[in-house]
From Swiss-Prot:
Binding site for Mn(2+) 1: 284, 298
Molecular function as annotated in GO: ATP binding; carbamoyl-phosphate synthase (ammonia) activity; carbamoyl-phosphate synthase (glutamine-hydrolyzing) activity; metal ion binding
Organism field: Clostridium botulinum (strain Alaska E43 / Type E3)
Gene Ontology CC terms: cytoplasm
Family: Belongs to the CarB family.
Binding site for Mn(2+) 2: 298, 300
ATP-grasp domain segment(s): 133-327, 674-864
Co-factor requirement: Mg(2+); Mn(2+)
Binding annotation for Mn(2+) 3: 823, 835
Name this polypeptide is given: Carbamoyl phosphate synthase large chain
Domain notes: The large subunit is composed of 2 ATP-grasp domains that are involved in binding the 2 ATP molecules needed for carbamoyl phosphate synthesis. The N-terminal ATP-grasp domain (referred to as the carboxyphosphate synthetic component) catalyzes the ATP-dependent phosphorylation of hydrogencarbonate to carboxyphosphate and the subsequent nucleophilic attack by ammonia to form a carbamate intermediate.
PANTHER family in the record: CARBAMOYL-PHOSPHATE SYNTHASE [AMMONIA], MITOCHONDRIAL, CARBAMOYLTRANSFERASE FAMILY MEMBER
Binding site for Mg(2+) 2: 298, 300
Length: 1069
């Protein structure tokens, strides 16, 4: 039981959907916290809207509510469950903001709920820019010259007084949202306007820019008795000016003198004591590289992205200990789980180097402004561990899955030196390659240091890597002797990088290593630099002498993880990997996980029997397989990252459990797949590959418009578009062939039907479909961006029978053992297959939770030989539940300048929320509220710009919205359409007409909701694009699919009292 006997039932608020700035790290920390509380005999009540998380599994907390994270719904949970305490710091910025709002609204007092861990007062002092600055002044900690402003003019006046550039930091926002660096008044106006709108209290800190100073972070722990330690200090390679979430970060710091290290450590402890933190806290400093001058940037009075990184870098479980501290324990009373001998008051010691590199989404968004600044844009990150900086850094580069194994990037070879200088002075996501190219051309390190602010230490290390690359390029394989190869491996060079430089194959380098016995050894992450014996089975590779892995004779399976979070491959795959590991453990199989993502539950050291924190490349994975000699390897749960290893493992005669490389090829090769469907007598939309605009127009005439067009080789719908007439098709094809003449464009008949999706399990004889999911938006919107309903609402028994028949035929014909995901279209009473994925999909966590079928557990048992009939869930289609569950996508496009908002065949969402209700409309209402898509009725104004193809469909929806009180603003054509039907509408001028025009009313937030159905293309100069961007940057709802608007109108027409009639549901029941 907890030290504080008054704590019996604790409410934990999760962080909600994955968005840029708040990703999987809060699933990791929230899961740790819930398990720590339960281990102390405390009952845990969890509210979180994100169904893709481990945290919302019914085993993690005693009561789990997948409900919107709003005061209205949290109060319902508090009223129903009557918790005595609230733990606020585990749900990121979302959880922290909600705790403050619950306090300020009097809800905590009303239900007698006390905040444990860091208090509301301490949260406010850490988050409110003015209170924090005043406190720093009181305790004598330096802050940068700054001013708190709540209006535009005050900000401009202050900037004029201190001079540009200035940094804008809004209060209570996430990942630097609404912030930035302004070099002049025009930039300041734009950033300030955004920052004031996005801050929950309308407050912004303006400070004199110290861009170019070092950015240093300390992760600190403190208990209620005042005991305080620093867990880890971290150094951003990128100086102040780039958000720490977009910076390459090294732990421990590499360039601080002992005096600087101790000075900032002392400051961190002074700050955490003054604020009164009880738990974990992240402190960020700027440090003048030429003097001992420093300033406090900010603190995060909660677990954070940096604390997840610090936990994985050190093996010190910050979130778990923060939860125990909240229960009243002191650091000197909590045992270190890694050593089982020392206590949590011992500061961790690192005898290795950790490098974190962000993963950006720009491969999905070609038009995005890639320049990095104080607003975070990365969706995820990788972490690499090495015996030295070079090794960790090169491991990190190849972990990013961008096709790069070295710092040699062809793109930058064509750039002039002045272009390269511009690139490193205005850094983007590829700046490290531009910097390497400058060093390759012998540009002086001192000058690069001066123009970038990157420390000479790191530049010298990168210079050494570049010089070795050049030396290899000028050599041949006969020049590569044993000592040189061994040194290259010690410094992190992969076989592929060495082979590419020598113009041989990686297999040639592997053979040399084999002959010379140059094999990796594996070291343990033990928190204590080897001072005490560690029990944690947490390893990284080096090429040092001693190996710390003990290989057992048990039957063992290696599970390949999914790597960094990105659009199209998110936290859902980590969920699947973790459940696979748990299922294997139940079967008494030794489980080994390989992954490189510091944010996730899968890389918690006590999830698997062994954790290898390594890149997910062919060489790094093969090294581990050769070390461990497993019974088999599971790829099905690691998304495309794991699946793309299938052919390589087949070539090496390594057994993959479940679906094989040949079966994957059958599903993914268009020609083979078409032949399979024909053989099975299964329909798919008609289409073919075309090589010219003329051929495309002929094929479209044969098929009939609309048609779906896309490049040949795409992932996640990249480059797909629906065209409605010859003009649109010609526009698309002309641009597509201008970019790529070597590959055909695929053109298919676009069926504007109902999209249906299933995740199924096959044992080779039977299949089990846990549930049939129906998409709200018609085909043409990527499945990951669609609102998804379960049970399906409009699928008749005849079609359900066809779905079962087709799924069984496909699974058995392909030879699936484990999971298969199939997407269908129902069109005019017929069923068509549009896609088959022979692996786990992103809907697995959702359908597992809402159907009650432990899909991954069953699939894992099937891979190892079990039969579905023996596993207790039957075969064919599982019975449907009474409650209706709706999955609603969540987008982060606000964080990505110049990125298209419009829904289409290419996936854009970063996360999702769940809405659960007794009726579809209740579930939709909760889902829309949770995703922040539901319009507020205070103004009740909808801006509507509808293209010619959608006007007839829009009218009845507009009538229903007008009926419940919404007012419309529209440009001439749409306005006339509405008035002709008797709907009151206000006319507004187009963008190219005099002010105030349509763009002005969006920028001034004079509307509640923007409904914009796009015309052709994604041209950033088009009016529709500019309107959508302006709306999303001002946090206004944007709807581009009329099916979504129809659903909102249906919910509005419903007569239930949204405050009184809506129940909250505990999914553990």
């Amino acid at each position: 039981m907890p030290l504080n006997k008054d704590i019996k039932r604790v409410l934990v608020i999760g962080s909600g959907p994955i968005v840029i700035g708040q990703a999987a790290e809060f699933d990791y920390s929230g899961t740790q916290a819930c398990e720590a509380l339960k281990s102390e005999g405390v009952e845990v009540v969890l509210i979180n809207s994100n169904p893709a998380t481990i945290m919302t599994d019914k085993e993690v907390a005693d009561k789990v509510y997948l409900e919107p994270l709003t005061l209205e719904f949290i109060e319902k949970v508090i009223a129903k469950e009557k918790p005595d305490s609230l733990l606020a710091g585990m749900g990121g910025q979302t959880g922290l903001n909600l705790a403050v709002e619950l306090h300020d609204a009097g809800i905590l007092d009303k239900y007698n709920v006390k905040v444990i861990g860091t208090s509301i007062e301490s949260i406010k002092e850490g988050e409110d820019r003015e209170l924090f600055r005043d406190m720093m002044n009181r305790i004598g900690e330096p802050v940068i010259k700054s001013e708190i402003v709540t209006d535009l003019q005050a900000g401009i006046d202050f900037a004029n007084k201190i001079g540009y550039p200035v940094i804008v930091r809004p209060a209570y926002t996430l990942g630097g949202s609404g912030g930035g660096i302004a070099d002049d008044e025009e930039e300041l106006r734009t950033i300030l306007e955004s920052g004031l709108q996005l801050s929950t209290i309308g407050q912004v800190l303006l400070e004199k820019s110290v861009k170019g100073w070092k950015e240093i972070e300390y992760e600190v722990m403190r208990d209620s008795y005042g005991n305080c330690i620093t867990v880890c200090n971290m150094e951003n390679i990128d100086p102040v000016g780039i958000h720490t979430g977009d910076s390459i970060v090294v732990a421990p710091s590499q360039t601080l003198s002992d005096k600087e290290y101790q000075m900032l450590r002392t400051a961190s402890i002074n700050i955490i004591n003054a604020v009164g933190i009880e738990g974990g806290c992240n402190v960020q400093f700027s440090l003048n590289p030429n003097t001992f001058e420093y300033a406090v940037i900010e603190i995060n009075p909660r677990v954070s992205r940096s604390s997840a990184l610090a936990s994985k870098a050190t093996g010190y479980p910050i979130a778990k200990l923060a939860a125990k501290i909240a229960l009243g324990y002191g650091l000197d009373e909590i045992k270190n789980a890694v050593t089982q001998k020392t206590y949590a008051c011992f500061e961790p010691t690192l005898d290795y180097v950790v490098v974190k590199i962000p993963k950006w989404p720009f491969d999905k968004f070609f038009g995005a402004d890639r320049q990095l600044g104080t607003k975070m844009m990365a969706t995820g990150e990788i972490m690499a561990i090495g015996a030295n900086f070079e090794q960790a850094f090169l491991k990190g580069i190849r972990s990013l899955e961008i096709g790069k194994y070295s710092l040699d990037h062809k793109k930058f070879k064509e750039h002039s030196m002045s272009e390269l200088k511009d690139l490193v002075m205005k850094p983007d996501d590829e700046r490290i390659f531009a910097l390497a190219e400058m060093l390759r051309r012998d540009y002086m390190i001192e000058r690069i240091n001066k123009i970038t602010g990157i420390d000479k230490f790191f530049l010298e290390k990168i210079k050494w890597i570049v010089e070795e690359e050049q030396r290899l390029k000028l050599s041949n394989i006969e020049d590569l002797d044993k000592e040189w190869l061994k040194n290259l491996k010690k410094k992190g060079f992969s076989d592929k990088a060495i082979a590419d430089m020598l113009k041989v194959s990686p297999e040639d380098i592997y053979r040399l290593r084999d002959i010379w016995s140059i094999k990796p050894s594996y070291k343990m992450v033990d928190t204590c630099g080897g001072e005490f014996e560690a029990l944690s089975p947490y390893y990284y590779s080096t090429y040092e002498q001693y190996d710390e892995v003990e290989v057992s004779n048990r039957r063992k399976v290696i599970v390949i993880g999914s790597g960094p979070i990105r659009i199209g491959q998110g936290i859902e795959f980590d969920y699947a990997s973790v459940h696979c590991v748990k299922a294997l453990k139940k079967l008494d199989i030794e489980t080994i996980i390989v992954n490189n993502n510091p944010e996730t539950v899968s890389t918690d050291f006590d999830i698997s029997d062994k954790l290898y924190f390594e890149p997910l490349t062919e060489e790094d994975v093969l090294n581990i397989i050769e070390k461990e000699n497993p019974y088999g390897v599971i790829l099905q749960f690691g998304g495309q990252t794991a699946i793309k290893l299938a052919n390589f493992l087949k070539e090496k005669n390594i057994k993959t459990l479940g679906t094989t490389a040949d079966q994957i090829d059958m599903a993914e090769d268009r020609e083979k797949f078409d032949e399979l469907l024909e053989r099975l007598d299964i329909s798919r939309p008609k289409g073919k590959g075309i090589w010219s605009v003329e051929e495309g127009l002929e094929e479209a005439e044969r098929l009939g418009f609309p048609v779906l067009v896309r490049p040949s080789y795409v992932i996640g719908g990249q480059g797909m578009e629906i065209t409605h007439d010859e003009e649109e098709l010609t526009f698309y094809l002309t641009n597509a062939f201008a970019k790529d003449k070597k590959n055909p464009i695929l053109i298919d008949k676009y069926l504007m039907g109902r999209e249906i999706e299933v995740d199924a399990i096959s044992d080779g004889e039977n299949i089990l479909i846990p549930g049939i999911m129906e998409h709200l938006e018609r085909a043409g919107v990527h499945s990951g961006d669609s609102v998804t309903m379960y049970p399906s609402q409009n699928v008749c028994d005849k079609i359900k029978g066809k779905i079962l028949e087709y799924t069984k035929k496909l699974a058995l014909a392909i030879g699936i053992k484990g999971m298969i995901n199939i997407q269908f279209i129902e069109f005019e009473g017929s069923l068509y297959v549009i896609e088959v994925n022979p692996r786990a999909s992103r809907t697995v966590p959702y359908i597992s939770k809402v159907s009650g079928v432990p899909i991954v557990d069953i699939a894992t048992q099937v891979m190892l030989g079990a039969k579905l009939n023996d596993l207790g869930y039957g075969v064919d289609i599982y019975k449907e539940p009474e409650l209706i569950s709706v999955k609603v996508p969540v987008f982060s496009t606000q964080k990505l300048p110049n990125v298209e908002v419009c829904l289409g065949p290419e996936m854009r969402s970063t996360g999702e929320v769940l809405g659960v209700g007794r009726t579809l409309k209740e579930a939709l209402y909760k889902g829309f509220v949770g995703a922040n898509m539901y319009p507020s009725k205070e103004k009740g104004k909808i801006l509507a710009t509808i293209n010619k193809h959608n006007k007839a469909e829009f009218l009845p929806i507009a009538k229903d919205l007008a009926k419940v009180g919404y007012k419309f603003i529209a440009t001439t054509g749409t306005c006339k359409l509405l008035r002709d039907e008797g709907i009151d509408a206000e006319e507004i001028r187009k963008i190219d007409e005099e002010k105030p025009n349509i763009l002005d009313i969006v920028k001034n937030r004079e509307v509640d909701l923007v409904v914009n159905t796009p015309t052709k293309g994604n041209d950033s100069k088009r009016d529709g694009f500019l309107i959508r961007r302006a709306a999303v940057e001002r946090n206004l709802g944007v709807i581009t699919a009329l099916d979504t608007l129809r659903a909102i109108a249906d919910v509005e027409l419903e007569e239930f009292d949204k405050n009184k009639d809506l129940e909250v549901f505990d999914i553990t029941k």
